[in-house]
Amino acid sequence: MTTKRKPYVRGMQPNWWTKLGFYRFYITREGTCLPQLWFSLVVLFGVFALKNGPESWAGFVGFLSNPIVMLINIVTLIATVFHTATWFKLAPKAVNIVVKDEKLPQEPIVRGLWGLTIVVTVVILAVALIV
């Protein structure tokens, strides 16, 4: 048996996610993809500038020295650190590591991830300064 009545569809406001802190946090975290897109485009532009010779590279460096670009890059760095911190807090929840019949606490995993990040960053900076 079918009916000709329309089913009730509850209205959804465009700002529904602002009412709960969890959703605001989630949308903010997922919104960090926009600064990551900026960073990816800047790196891609830099690679092509490097490929096209010294004049092109000088133009790219000039572009990076623009105060607005510096501000956008600082915002991108902050967004990246925020995204990394939240990701490192989520990672132990997805991994179930058992040591001697006990689940490994989250803190050693998070500390290990931050330690690895610091080591890799120092190695990359050292290589960049040596070469």
Curated annotation (Swiss-Prot):
It is found in: Cell inner membrane. The keyword Amino-acid biosynthesis does not apply. Keywords: Cell inner membrane, Cell membrane, Membrane, Transmembrane, Transmembrane helix. It holds the Pfam family Fumarate_red_C. The chain crosses the membrane at residues 30-50, 58-78, 109-129. The keyword Membrane applies. GO terms for cellular component: fumarate reductase complex; plasma membrane. It is a multi-pass membrane protein. Belongs to the FrdC family. Two distinct, membrane-bound, FAD-containing enzymes are responsible for the catalysis of fumarate and succinate interconversion; fumarate reductase is used in anaerobic growth, and succinate dehydrogenase is used in aerobic growth. Anchors the catalytic components of the fumarate reductase complex to the cell inner membrane, binds quinones. Part of an enzyme complex containing four subunits: a flavoprotein (FrdA), an iron-sulfur protein (FrdB), and two hydrophobic anchor proteins (FrdC and FrdD). This is Fumarate reductase subunit C. It comes from Proteus mirabilis (strain HI4320). The lineage of its organism: Bacteria, Pseudomonadati, Pseudomonadota, Gammaproteobacteria, Enterobacterales.
